[in-house]
């Protein structure tokens, strides 16, 4: 991990822990989870939002005003909207994607759940997703929430990341392994 990624992750983890502890104190983890989901969806859907949080062109006041409007529009819980306002005033909004990921991890841990990131070459059907969720839950002895994404470059197969484990059954990985083997022989 690069130094800047490590620093960003550290900043996001500190904010996430503080927000999570506050939500836990107020018995408001459900609202925090809903807010994290809304922020994640907004980040994925809006290029302007991603630009706002990462571009140095916007001033603190512009970022604070925009993030306040977004928090109001999304009807985020006060603890989350206040944290976003603080992050804007400190020019820390660039860690928002990592913050959302950290919040989700803390919430999942609190609920005894685990998140699995599944990358497939083609979209998984509902039946495939349900079966995969069931198998992963059985292997982890926890409730598993699956985040499914599509990456056509895999050619076929799946890449499953769950906790510190990664299983790569993609055609791309097998072709790369074959290529490396052929380099060693030749």
UniProtKB/Swiss-Prot annotation:
Gene3D superfamilies: N-terminal domain of the delta subunit of the F1F0-ATP synthase (1.10.520.20). Pfam families: OSCP. Belongs to the ATPase delta chain family. One of its GO terms (cellular component) is plasma membrane. F-type ATPases have 2 components, F(1) - the catalytic core - and F(0) - the membrane proton channel. F(1) has five subunits: alpha(3), beta(3), gamma(1), delta(1), epsilon(1). CF(0) has four main subunits: a(1), b(1), b'(1) and c(10-14). The alpha and beta chains form an alternating ring which encloses part of the gamma chain. F(1) is attached to F(0) by a central stalk formed by the gamma and epsilon chains, while a peripheral stalk is formed by the delta, b and b' chains. It is a peripheral membrane protein. PANTHER family: ATP SYNTHASE DELTA CHAIN (PTHR11910). Keywords: ATP synthesis, Cell inner membrane, Cell membrane, CF(1), Hydrogen ion transport, Ion transport, Membrane, Transport. F(1)F(0) ATP synthase produces ATP from ADP in the presence of a proton or sodium gradient. F-type ATPases consist of two structural domains, F(1) containing the extramembraneous catalytic core and F(0) containing the membrane proton channel, linked together by a central stalk and a peripheral stalk. During catalysis, ATP synthesis in the catalytic domain of F(1) is coupled via a rotary mechanism of the central stalk subunits to proton translocation. This protein is part of the stalk that links CF(0) to CF(1). It either transmits conformational changes from CF(0) to CF(1) or is implicated in proton conduction. PROSITE patterns: ATPASE_DELTA. GO terms for molecular function: proton-transporting ATP synthase activity, rotational mechanism. It is found in: Cell inner membrane. This is ATP synthase subunit delta.
